Amino acid sequence: MGSSRLRVFDPPLERKDSAALSERQLPLPTFDVPYFKYIDEEDEDDEWGSRSQSSTEDDSVDSLLSDRYVVVSGTPEKILEHLLNDLHLAEVQHKETETLLDDFLLTYTVFMTTDDLCQALLRHYSAKKYQGEEENSDVPCRKRKVLHLVSQWISLYKDWLHEDEHSKMFLKTIYRNVLDDVYEYPILEKELKEFQKILGMHRRHTVDEYSPQKKNKALFHQFSLKENWLQHRGTVAETEEIFCHVYVTEHSYISVKAKVSSTAQEILKVVAEKLQRAEEDLALVAIMFSGEKHEFQPNDLAISKSLEASGRIYVYRKDLADTLNPFAENEESQQRSMRILGMNTWDLALELMSFDWSLFNSIHEQELIYFTFSRQGSGEHTVNLSLLLQRCNEVQLWVATEILLCSQLGKRVQLVKKFIKIAAHCKAQQNLNSFFAIVMGLNTASVSRLSQTWEKIPGKFKKLFSELESLTDPSLNHKAYRDAFKKMKPPKIPFMPLLLKDVTFIHEGNKTFLDNLVNFEKLHMIADTVRTLRHCRTNQFGSDMSPKEQQELKSYVNHLYVIDSQQALFELSHRLEPRA
C-alpha cells in the first residue's frame, strides 16, 4: 500500500459519515482509496487522525491507484483552506495534493462564483496569521502558496479568465499586492517573476528598486505597460467561431466554419469555391420564415442569432434570381459523387482528423462542466464543445447525403465501400468522433434500407463493417469502445457524446450538496472524467500530407454538403429503391 496519510476531523464523526456514505449510495471504488472525512466549520481545533479503506484488489491495481485520497465534502472555504495547507512549494507536488488542486480548480464554479473565489484568495493572501498557528515567518510562505494556486488557475483556464471582469480585477489587485510585498518579503521575487511571465508582462525593476519611496512610481510604471494577457483575445462576439449553414436547396446546406464577424463576401467566397462556381455569379440572401427576403451586400455581417431564429441564409445564382432553389439536386449530385470517389480514403480520413482535432484541441476542460451543470450563461462557455458535437452530427448527415444523392447503383455501391474504408481509417487514426459518426451514418434508416445496394457490397467489406459496428455496440456500458479506446495512445479523439454521457451520469446520480456541504467526492469523479481530454491531448496531432493534396481535401472536408431533413432523406431513399 501507499504511505499517504489520511487526516480526519473529530473521530466521533467517522461513524456518522460512514452511515451517510451508505445512505448516499455513491459508487464506492473497489481499489484502495483513503478518504478525507467531512471538513466542517466546527471542531477546528480537534486533533488530526487517520483512516484508510481496506482493499482486496491485486497489487497491480493498488500500485496504479494508491497514494490518492479524496476530500469527501466540506464548505467551500474549508476545502480551499485545506488545499492551501497541503500545498508544497517544491517543484513537484505530492500526487494527492496535485489531484485535489486540479479537482478544485476544474469544478469550483459548481459551488462558488469566480468572485467568491477571488475574494477568498485575497483574504488568504493578506492574512498576517492563520488561526493563530503560523508565525510571522510563515506569512510569506502562505502568500507563495496563494500565488502558486493562482498560477495554476491561470494556466488551466487561460483566456477564460481574461473574459471575466471579476478575475481581471482580482489579478490586477493581487499583482499590486505582490509589488507592495516584495520589498518586505524578498522571497516573493521568484513568484513575482513567474506571475509576470504568466500575465505576459515584463518587469523592468529589481527588488532593490522597491523602496517605500519608489513604490508608487514603480506601480504606475508597471500598469502603464500593455497587459498582453488582457489583449490576448478580442471580445467574444468578434472571435467566436460557429458553423454557418448556407442553404443550397430547401433541405440541403453547405456548412461553413466562420467567425461571427464574417462578412457576406467572405462567406460567399467559401461557398462559391465549394460549389465550383464563379463568385461574381452568386449572391447570398436571407429568407425569413415569414417569406420576407433580404439580399446581403458584400460588407454586410451575415451571421446573427436573430437570423438563426427567424430565417435562413440561401445562396442563389444571379441569373436565376426568381427561383428559390436554383441548384437542382440532379445538377450537382453526379459531380459530387465523382469527386469523392476520386479521393484517397486514407488522406480523406486524415483531413477529417485534422479538422476534428482543431475543434477538439480548442475545447476547455471546463466546457464539459458548464455543459453538464447548465449554469446561467453556459452557452458562451461551451462554444468549442458545441462545435464538435455539431460536427459529429454533420458527418453523420454527410454520409447519408452523399449516398442518397447518388442515383447510379454501381457508383452508390462504390460510395458505401468508400465510407466503410474511411471509417476504418478514422479508427486507425484514433479519431473516434468521426468514426462513430460515419458508422451511424451508414446505419441511418434511410441508408440501411437500401437492400439492392447492400446486396452488392462484397463479403469482405460487409465483414469489415460488421467488425467496425461491434466497436459501437452499447452493451455493457459500451465496453467494446472503452476497452479499445483505453489501449490507444495520444493523440486521440474520444466519442464526445459518450464522454458527456459519463459526466452527466455522475452528476445526475449524486447530489452536489449534502447537508449544505459540497459533495466533493462527486466533483472529484467528474474532474477525473473530464481529465480524459488532457490525456488525449498529451501529444499533438500533425498531418504529413503535401500542401497541394491537403488544400483540395481541406476545402472538401471543411465545408461538407448535407441534407438535414430526415423526411427529405427518406424521400430520396424511396426514390432510389421504392418499397416493394
Curated annotation (Swiss-Prot):
GO terms for molecular function: GTP-dependent protein binding; guanyl-nucleotide exchange factor activity. Keywords: Guanine-nucleotide releasing factor, Nucleus. Residues 344-579 form the Ras-GEF domain. CDD domains: RasGEF, REM. It is found in: Nucleus. Induction: Down-regulated in nerve growth factor-treated PC12 cells. Guanine nucleotide exchange factor (GEF) for RAP1A, RAP2A and MRAS/M-Ras-GTP. Its association with MRAS inhibits Rap1 activation. This is Rap guanine nucleotide exchange factor 5.
